[in-house]
Amino acid sequence: MDKLTTGEFLANRPSSGDITLDLGAGQAVELTHLEKVYWPDEGSTKGDLLRYYVSVADFIMPYLQDRPAILKRYPNGIRPLPAGAEVKRKDRGTDFRNRDGGFFQQNLDPATVPPFVKTALLTTIEMAHPVNYAVYTNLATLLYLVNLGTIAHNPWHSRLENLDSPDYIVFDLDPHVAPWENVVQLAL
């Protein structure tokens, strides 16, 4: 497996295979299947997404820092399920598949993640059992989560040290079948 610095990764744009990305200060993260197409219509790959996160990490990490993560993973890219395909759900509510081929994941097994990935065992009102959430701590963790196929990140609105005090709010307006004009009107 080739070992690259972040500068080399951004400049050389390896289009396939697996690499070890040297983040400096003794940290490295394995990035795999860079050639996997995540957005078929655009031809954009997993490697393109990882390069994007390397390039914006300095700007987004202060907002993600120390927040538990709910991941929406698309390990095979964004691909609508064929008509009639079954949407799978796990019984405990920690993972479920969507019609676009993605699934939400909250529970990570601490025994299966690299040592640099911090997890926090938390119980919420929605979840009757404790869940091991990944916690955004640094670029290595962010890239590890993206390498799992995470395209949509849903960080908690509070930080680990003060979970009962969110420091921002989001109004998530999902139109589903409603006309876009209705969403715009509601937002105003």
Predicted features by range, described:
Residues 52, 181-188:
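Long, well-ordered alpha-helical scaffolding segments within enzyme catalytic domains
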